[in-house]
């Protein structure tokens, strides 16, 4: 099992939305590196839900990958802000995964706290200016995060 960190703005789609929905398609990713990370995911992988563009930003919950290799439907919808006119149903450019809500941690682990606990090599999200919305989390770092965050 691998671990990931996946960012979303809480007012757009936060951990509360996922808790209510139970599962969600993680769609709208329009960065090739983030897309390729999603393509590397496997069923059963876990992902830390990170609230970005929040005060403060940080890890709030845990998700599990339940489906992989899905075509992102938003790329074909002209009314969707993630519409991609260059993407065609016979040759889609963008993928997504389905995630299941696992739990919400009792307290947010802020970016500032993460920077105090982890180096850039241990947890890439602490790199200044890192805007990538999906990042791998090394197993040793995931273990430490779970210890710091406690049960959810």
Walk through the language-model features, giving the residues of each.
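Aromatic- and Lys/Arg-enriched surface recognition patch
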Residues: 62-128, 132
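Residues in well-ordered beta-strands of folded domains
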Residues: 7, 27, 66, 100, ...
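Compositionally biased, charged N-terminal/linker segments
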Residues: 1-43, 141-142, 149-152
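Short, ligand-facing micro-motifs at secondary-structure edges
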Residues: 16, 58-64
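A broad, low-specificity signal marking well-ordered, structured residues that form hydrophobic/aromatic
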Residues: 3-4, 24, 97, 132-135
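Short, charged beta-turn/beta-strand-edge "cap" motif at the junction between a beta-strand
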Residues: 50-57
């Amino acid at each position: 099992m691998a671990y990931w960190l996946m960012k979303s703005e809480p007012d757009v789609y936060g951990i509360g939305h996922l808790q209510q929905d139970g599962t969600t398609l993680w769609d709208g990713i329009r960065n090739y590196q983030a897309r390729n990370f999603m393509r590397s995911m496997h069923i059963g992988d876990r992902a830390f839900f990170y609230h970005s563009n929040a005060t403060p930003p940080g890890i709030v919950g845990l998700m599990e990958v339940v489906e992989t290799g899905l075509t992102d439907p938003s790329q074909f919808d002209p009314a969707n802000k993630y519409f991609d006119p260059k993407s065609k149903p016979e040759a889609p450019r963008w993928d997504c995964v389905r995630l299941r809500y696992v739990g919400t941690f009792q307290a947010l682990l802020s970016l500032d706290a993460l920077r105090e606990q982890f180096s850039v090599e241990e947890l890439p999200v602490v790199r200044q200016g890192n805007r990538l919305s999906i990042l791998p989390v090394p197993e040793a770092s995931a273990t430490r995060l779970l210890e710091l965050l406690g049960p959810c």
